[in-house]
């Protein structure tokens, strides 16, 4: 095999795309900072138990594992950053009030999340710890929408769900893990006959409620129907109220609901959301409330947040035009060097043309040049 061949679903990022990714990264972090979020940088490599404790089998299968040559302990290359940020909040910051944290860095997956996806996403995320109220959920959604606006994503829409609805319907029932997985599968596939078979021994209210969920997807009228159908279940009513409050804050955005959507059921503890945009075959952003995320670190704080893959985002938003550069001759003269330095300090891109290479400036378009006129270096249009 040729030495330059990379592993499947791993790729080099070339200049034009790298520039776009970096501009998006800066814009996303600046947007998070404008909301009061502080940047943290967890390590790419960590003890395996710290990365996987409480995360479930899915993340375990996605994590590359190796042995530490210093200690002999098992290490993992992070497949998701949320658990690390929860550890930082619980032990390193240990704040009593609200903590707003954001991050942006690579993660590694043993398998791609979807067809043609990279196994090395650049994950950006923001999380708010310490507030159990709906305000934190709303802020997470609003910040994620603002992040997509800053990236110029088009035709953005939000899909909302809440795991508390199904949990409320199943509360107190003697449902084993295997049967629970089957029920989840039937709900995800919207398979009414399979769900009816699986729930035939359930109390009628729970059975009818679960079957009703298969039809409860669409616009806000879904919430009205659900409130009528799920009256016997206080947990479901609370979840519906929260979904209505979240949706009310999203002006100018198409909002849909799918009350049978159970993605992240073992991870989320309340409302969850997925955000789509023109050109994306899958959700660009996923987030919600995950109050149990810090429990394994001895500090079970309320938490809400979201994450996205900047490399996925770059594929669906247009790159801003590159600011035209200035072409300058190569030289070591004091006046020339001073003129170039002054222009660069002013924010200009100045490309010095090396001897024998004419106007080779790669992706930079030069619409001006630095020329010597009457003993002074001046910028002129080309």
From Swiss-Prot:
Family annotation (Pfam families): tRNA-synt_His
This protein's UniProt keywords: Amino-acid biosynthesis, Cytoplasm, Histidine biosynthesis
MF term (GO), any: histidine-tRNA ligase activity
Keyword Nucleotidyltransferase among record annotations: no
InterPro entries given in the database record: aa-tRNA-synth_II/BPL/LPL, HisRS-like_core, HisRS/HisZ, HisZ
Compartments, as annotated in UniProt: Cytoplasm
GO cellular component, one term: cytoplasm
Keyword Cytoplasm: yes
Pathway the protein acts in: Amino-acid biosynthesis; L-histidine biosynthesis; L-histidine from 5-phospho-alpha-D-ribose 1-diphosphate: step 1/9
GO biological process: histidyl-tRNA aminoacylation; L-histidine biosynthetic process
Taxonomy, superkingdom: Bacteria
Biological role: Required for the first step of histidine biosynthesis. May allow the feedback regulation of ATP phosphoribosyltransferase activity by histidine.
Oligomeric and partner information: Heteromultimer composed of HisG and HisZ subunits.
PANTHER family in the cross-refs: HISTIDINE--TRNA LIGASE, MITOCHONDRIAL-RELATED, HISTIDYL-TRNA SYNTHETASE
Stated family: Belongs to the class-II aminoacyl-tRNA synthetase family. HisZ subfamily.
Additional detail: This function is generally fulfilled by the C-terminal part of HisG, which is missing in some bacteria such as this one.
Record-given protein name: ATP phosphoribosyltransferase regulatory subunit
Origin species: Acidovorax ebreus (strain TPSY) (Diaphorobacter sp. (strain TPSY))
